[in-house]
């Protein structure tokens, strides 16, 4: 099971989301904790200025950006639509 931490940026972005999407975020984070779900969540490496970071999908529009702290620990950096990569 993966331990998940949150940055202040993630918490602020999460607080701005619509309530219905917040529930989806909670469910996706819970799924992310189990590596078996990473393919379904489309966990992927980011490139360019976000090299070293990873992302996973909530749906077709929304993403979570994170970094691995260790093999079993991740820190979530932000959540939002594709503009989080700008």
State the predicted function of each range.
Residues 20, 44-49, 53, 61, ...:
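Surface-exposed loop/turn and secondary-structure junction residues enriched for glycine/proline
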Residues 4, 8, 12, 16, ...:
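Enriched for short, Lys/Arg-rich terminal
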Residues 28-31, 82:
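Conserved short hydrophobic interaction patches
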């Amino acid at each position: 099971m993966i331990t998940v931490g949150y940055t202040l940026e993630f918490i602020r972005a999460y607080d701005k989301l619509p309530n219905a999407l917040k529930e989806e975020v909670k469910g996706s984070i819970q799924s992310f904790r189990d590596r078996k779900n990473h393919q379904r969540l489309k966990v992927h490496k980011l490139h360019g200025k976000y090299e070293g970071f990873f992302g996973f999908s909530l749906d077709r529009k929304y993403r979570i950006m994170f970094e691995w702290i260790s093999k079993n620990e991740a820190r979530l950096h932000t959540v939002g639509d594709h503009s989080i990569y700008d």
